[in-house]
Amino acid sequence: MKFDNEQLLKYIGACTSPYHTVDTSLQMLLDSGFIELSLEDEWQLDSGSYVVNVFGTTLFAFHIGKKPEHTLRIASAHTDFPAIRVKPNPITSMKGYTKLNVEMYGGLIENTWLDRPLGAAGTVVLKGKNAFDVDSVLVDTKRPIAIVPNLAIHMNRSVNDGVKLNRQKEMLPILMMERSNEDNPTKALNYRNNPSLFPESDSQYDEWTKFLADEVDCDPSEILSYEMTLYPTEQGCVLGTEGDFISSPRLDNLTSCFGVLSGIIQAKKMNFNGIRCAILFDNEEVGSRTKQGGAGMILPNLVKRVYDALGYSNQEMDSFISKGFMISSDVAHGLHPNYPEKNDITNIPVLNKGVALKIACSQSYAGDAKAIAIVKGLCEEADAQYQIYVNRSDIPGGSTVGSISAAMLPERTIDVGLPLLAMHSARELMGAADQEQLNRLMNHFLGGK
């Protein structure tokens, strides 16, 4: 059966913030028969498939086979991506324009965000019964609400020579034209005559708070806080005269999330011995050092809770971990045809040639000789194409969560990922044949013997 990239694009289109990535992924697993657990409850486990929402932006799913002591296999990815985040108290004005005060999340390529229609997605937290019992609501505008316009070439003749953007000044999106009570004479007159009839006046809540209140359908006074991401509203697409490519926002790292989810669903279907786990971390793009990130204790704590609930001792658990294996999936740099000198001279991954096995002697990518051999064998057994990626010796690449999480859970680990062009652009490019190869690897790793 031909692999359906439209399912990948549909998934990416729904995952417009880390919160929505977890929500969409959780629903996929629940629809596949996984049982949802809570971090706050005591777990009673038996053979079966389970999923845990971790603080809203990280997801942990696992399948317990008939004999759980046989193997521990873990596949990981991350739910976050470079983006523009809205600051608190974000409304600022300039000569009739209403702008949003924002900050950059992760290492995005700034100029690729200019002139793009931007939507907003994330979570809004509302007042609850008391300070500790608040309500969180997911929000996705699903329509463009803001834009960061470029400066015309007539006002910047050197723009094509390269421009460094000031994030605080030149990356602020326009939200709307300023409004005032004078724009609505009836409202203005009524407010002057009877201000008590308008307790939620324009001076009390800014335009952003009122906008969020409209999206959530609540009173502005109920909103306590939010985490909102701006995202390009253009959808991903297959392109090229022969349909060879996929152009889309957020390929880093939703391609990996999609592959890992495919694998853990396959684990449930096949029900082999051992414990098979999938974890989608948050905050990889900003260093992972958070409660829900790969540099925290969340993965070892979750694994321990699984083995505790099954009645195993710490010593038995340590033994299973030492015999286990983890694949960390994050994208790699494919050969760019306009910049071929940027890649290594002998280890050159290209689009549409399969999964890249990422190797770095600095351990910025996790792996050792045995781990590399194991994943090559898995690819061959799964009939999944693979290739080798190593950075140029004089151009350090990025790091990812593989080495970080392996340091917290000492299990043999390898970093893999799909080759991309334009990584961290507002719109990235991948090979249309490659997602199938990653899914094959993950299906075999988590769902195979």
Model-derived features with residue positions:
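N-terminal hydrophobic/helix-forming segments and targeting peptides
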Residues: 1-449
